[in-house]
Amino acid sequence: MANNKSAQKRIQVNERNRLQNRFYKSSVRTLIKVFLKNLEIYKTSKSPEGKEKLQKILSSVYSLIDKGTKKNVFHKNAAARKKAKLASSLKIS
């Protein structure tokens, strides 16, 4: 356990930030899985509603990745890499 106030505060701040980072990373992973699952469904049906749904999911993934980057959860290059991978997977289909 920490002996002085500043060390105790750092422990509290680090724990708070760890939980926030975990939330962002988990949410991004979950949304990416949802996007990829819907992408597979779209590849089989090719419906315009499916394409619209994919665009909506993709924009929400982008938004969450950008918010995480702004809060230093993701490095900017890692965020760009994730977004490019998703965009290329949509473009291929």
Swiss-Prot record:
Gene3D superfamilies given in the database record: Ribosomal protein S20
Disulfide bonds: none
Subcellular localization: Plastid, Chloroplast
Gene Ontology terms: biological process: translation
SUPFAM superfamilies: Ribosomal protein S20
Primary location recorded for the protein, binned into one broad class: plastid
Record bears the keyword Ribonucleoprotein: yes
A single Gene Ontology CC term: chloroplast
Record key words, sorted: Chloroplast, Plastid, Ribonucleoprotein, Ribosomal protein, RNA-binding, rRNA-binding
InterPro entries recorded: Ribosomal_bS20, Ribosomal_bS20_sf
GO molecular function annotations of the record: small ribosomal subunit rRNA binding; structural constituent of ribosome
Assigned protein family: Belongs to the bacterial ribosomal protein bS20 family.
Function of the molecule: Binds directly to 16S ribosomal RNA.
Protein name in the entry: Small ribosomal subunit protein bS20c
Organism listed in the record: Phaeodactylum tricornutum (strain CCAP 1055/1)
GN (gene name): rps20
